[in-house]
């Protein structure tokens, strides 16, 4: 899960009339070299009023004829920039980890705490590093094996085959210090995506261990059932499981009272893997994927998009695209599974429209935040000064004629769904990862971030990956130059020069999507590896998605 813990659930999940008052809807041919437009298309600052009325089953969200799909061609200058950015991300995963396990930390400042999601991104980053020549295949394979053996060999790090959100980076077991102690379905899903990618790339013993872990995942154990959940919340994958006591982390406990019920990226990724499970008794019915609610909204007239009101952060459109090649799967078909009142959606196009909305609203910048602009956009979850923030923006909601409240779309007071610009902090990974959808705008944003300077002329956000001189596990965070590329987030000063802030830390689940999204935009390597795997092929077939 993108927020650091379930405690930040309010920023990402549905808050309807569910259990305990919470009903969780929780929880990559325009040439890239072209300069992106400088004026936003029409759109709303705050979607307080409905944009119009539609019958959901009549809506098809698909790619316009002639629009370029990834992978793209980039200029030599752009490729040089992308090499640098990816190399910096890889340095985090290679150098910041614990030498005993190989596992990258959740954040560089806490080397003993790893997130299983971060490890999933880490495993997927290693094939990129081999193909780019930063490490040898043998080195990457050995590190991958070390990580997988560590995780497979510790029986206290998982329940029902899914992993605890946070683990001890030195042992792969229960951490003495963690932000939460829960078995997390989304963080496990992100790990399994990395394991599947590694299995396809390395084969051999890596595949044997990785495939075994994937097969052990019993998604059916985590499905919401019974009176503990509202009727419209039942038979979805829950966010996870919490033990009764940490003394017995695999003993008794209970499912969390939150479910993946909306069609954000995290919801779909969890449910896809649950459908694709290679062990028949562990799998869920494919119709669950199509029952995920698809609330509709609009930023540009005539271009509907699926959205949900619990988070307008850009990351909710990014994660699944790091592995699933939605661009070439075409619009899905809920009606084929007898699920009514659902739009047919090409999820790549849906993410592109959402990306466009984020940039449009940053250019208009009605909140007057000094950081936001033509080349600084993509409000998303990240560190902020004094904590962690999940800002975001929303389309105008469309009235879904004939649809059932709560069952087909989340119920909320649309007058209170307003764009949340937070304190104006921007995380470079957000616009950078959107290179999968809007390559020209993403390149321009990364070049902007790369060129920002301090008053003394030194780089504001950039730490050159070529300058890395530390040993494995010595991150030199205090020195401020660890060689990990972009800082996690920043906020520019207000007029008068006060308020400048740059995040001092580096976060695995921000570095991860950036390196993978760029690679998919350049070569499609990660989506190709993912779709080569038998488990993924089975999931695509079961869901009757288009050919890869």
Predicted features and spans:
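Bacterial N-terminal signal peptides
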Residues: 7-24
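Ser/Thr/Asn(+Pro)-rich, low-complexity disordered segments
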Residues: 52-548
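Generic alpha-helix initiation/capping and coil-helix boundary signal
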Residues: 7-10, 43, 313
